């Protein structure tokens, strides 16, 4: 059976950078190029495609342009710390290095990297191609299905938790993948600045979804709820539905490439070595020279 690897570029680049941030200070002190994220992410991605047999490979990134979510909710992701300049300058080089490694690198104004991953995963699933998604973003868990697995990166790609159709409920509070966005609508998500419904914490949110399944069904059974819960939920349905919508990953956006053009390509060895050499990543120059 054919397999595709889909990587959340921003997520892994952040992990790569902050896992090795001490090297940034060393680079500053010695007037060297910032290269810690390039080196670490390239190693992550290389190890993933060497450890598994994939026929397709995509890494998606966010763009600087506002997304449709920003237009709906001005506060979306407003509390996130700005990306360090020392990482920003490495992103174009990371993208180029990944192309040399054989990946299709993609991005699309108006959408997040998640939406590209969701839409490509949907295309692969329709052709019964197994998909492995790698990210540290729990939003990706909503994409799990019979053909799609999500590897949640805890410490880069060295420590990961695999979510699939069989183990999902045991790992995610007894809920199903489609309920991830329902959970975020009720409980919120601090990382995206989604407040959820005031007074509804994780425990109560899980209980409600285990019993009623969706936000809509909770409100269908509103009169059967205890008085205290009714007070918390009263007139909050549209807020919860909005947050749930914002958390939902698009799976149907128009893509610039069809899946026939997303196959993993042979490594462009000399071009990759030149990029690594120019950015003083000597350990990887040696590594890829031996391939």
From Swiss-Prot:
Entry keyword Nuclease: yes
Entry's Gene Ontology BP terms: DNA replication, Okazaki fragment processing
Keyword vocabulary terms for this entry: DNA-binding, Exonuclease, Hydrolase, Nuclease
5'-3' exonuclease domain span: 176-269
Pfam families associated with the record: 5_3_exonuc (PF01367), 5_3_exonuc_N (PF02739)
Major enzyme class: hydrolase
Keyword Hydrolase: yes
Assigned EC number: 3.1.11.-
Superkingdom, natural source: Bacteria
GO molecular function: 5'-3' exonuclease activity; 5'-flap endonuclease activity; DNA binding
Function (record text): 5'-3' exonuclease acting preferentially on double-stranded DNA.
Protein name: 5'-3' exonuclease
Phylogenetic placement of the source organism: Bacteria, Bacillati, Mycoplasmatota, Mycoplasmoidales, Mycoplasmoidaceae
